[in-house]
From Swiss-Prot:
Protein name: Putative uncharacterized protein YGR079W
Highest taxon in the source lineage: Eukaryota
Regions of compositional bias (Acidic residues) in chain numbering: 139-148
Signal peptide, first to last residue: 1-27
Annotated keywords: Glycoprotein, Signal
Lineage: Eukaryota, Fungi, Dikarya, Ascomycota, Saccharomycotina
Glycosylation positions in this chain: N59, N98, N126, N171, N221, N230, N262
Segments for region (Disordered): 81-101, 123-167
Length: 370
């Protein structure tokens, strides 16, 4: 309770001492701290703490109180624009007042981006006019340049966003490099592009006439993209070979040719034309159309049924089978009937194997479990 009372008295004295002068406060605090014998702090440390508390309480508007609390005043803010600082300096000298506050109250920084390239030309022109009218203080200009270089801001437009790779056709020369075929612009003046902001509207047309010639016209429409193109007929591709064969047959047999108005062929006509073409390729009186189809293994139509041209059902003869086996590369084995002895032997082997499997089942399971 005594320590709490002592602390309350200390805060009460601090509030009272805010109304007194600074010299009286120092002596009073020293006398008060000497009278306190139960405090754990030494005399010098206690006096230093109380002195700092009273000093901060009396001078709240000073930098000692504002900097630790992260309070930034207008005095800490430096001017950022060259033209605005010069205007503020002239007004301040005429009125006889401080110029730092007026410089801070100027308009904010204009950050040059890709969208503000057109407006950057007019801003740079105004800045150059202000520089031409006020060339008296060279020392102030150097200080402003140093300040802008340290802060990283500048009133001039950033050349990074200016399209230097595009030809501006204003007081500039072009040079062709070895690696690049397009002309590279060599600007002797950085503000050439921004001075001709009005002519930048017609820059794409000038570039097009420069690179592709005056006769080039960009008349491409959406209809050209969706223009219909005649495709290939799949039926004509499939029946191209059959038509060629039909023409060859007509040339060989002009009497058998029948005139047809339709170009498309049916399935029956397609098969007949193939059979006739096979007969024309291999003419032989003894061979029939079925035999020619069997002998030619690379033919695209196989035998559909065992009927002849008259519609009667006929089986294959043994000659055709022998011819087909000889022409094919399949290995044929002669069929031999099994004797009774072989049949009994197979049955005995099956029985023995079954008995062995039943006897050795227990041993196999035991070995598997181990």
């Amino acid at each position: 309770m005594s320590s709490a009372a002592n602390e309350g008295c200390v805060y009460l004295f601090i509030v009272v001492l805010r109304l007194s002068s600074f010299s009286c406060v120092n002596s009073f605090i020293h006398s008060f701290t000497r009278s306190r014998t139960r405090s754990s702090y030494s005399l010098d440390e206690r006096s230093l703490v109380s002195y700092s508390i009273v000093y901060v309480a009396m001078n709240k508007s000073s930098k000692a109180f504002q900097v630790p609390n992260k309070v930034i005043t207008k005095e800490d803010i430096t001017p950022l624009s060259r033209s605005h600082t010069k205007k503020a300096d002239t007004r301040g000298t005429a009125d006889g007042k401080n110029t730092t506050a007026s410089a801070v109250e100027a308009t904010p920084i204009i950050i040059t981006t890709a969208r503000s390239i057109d407006t950057a030309g007019s801003l740079s022109e105004n800045a150059t006019e202000d520089d031409g009218t006020q060339n008296g203080d060279l020392h102030d200009d150097d200080d402003d340049d140093d300040l802008e270089s340290t802060l990283g801001y500048s009133s001039e437009p950033d050349p990074l966003f200016s399209p230097c790779h595009q030809p501006s056709f204003t007081n500039s020369t072009f040079s062709y490099s070895a690696d690049n075929e397009l002309p590279m612009e060599e600007n002797h003046n950085k503000n050439n592009f921004h001075d001709s902001s009005e002519s930048s509207i017609f820059l794409p047309q000038i570039q097009q006439s420069f690179f592709f010639g005056d006769n080039s016209k960009s008349d491409a429409n959406n209809t050209d993209f969706w223009k219909e193109v005649n495709g290939t007929a799949e039926e004509a591709i499939c029946l191209q070979e059959t038509r060629q064969r039909k023409c060859s047959l007509v040339a060989l047999h002009p009497g058998d040719a029948t005139t047809s108005s339709n170009d498309t062929l049916g399935i029956e006509d397609f098969i007949k034309d193939d059979i006739n073409s096979a007969e024309a390729m291999e003419p032989s009186p003894s061979s029939s159309p079925s035999s020619s189809l069997l002998d030619n293994l690379d033919y695209n139509i196989k035998l559909l049924c065992y009927r002849d041209n008259e519609g009667k059902f006929t089986l294959k003869k043994r000659k055709f089978l022998k011819n087909s086996l000889r022409s094919s590369s399949a290995i044929s084995k002669k069929w031999k009937p099994l004797s009774k002895r072989d049949k009994l032997l197979k049955r005995a082997i099956r029985r023995k194997s079954g008995v062995c499997q039943t006897l050795s089942a227990g041993f196999g399971i035991g070995e598997f479990m181990l």
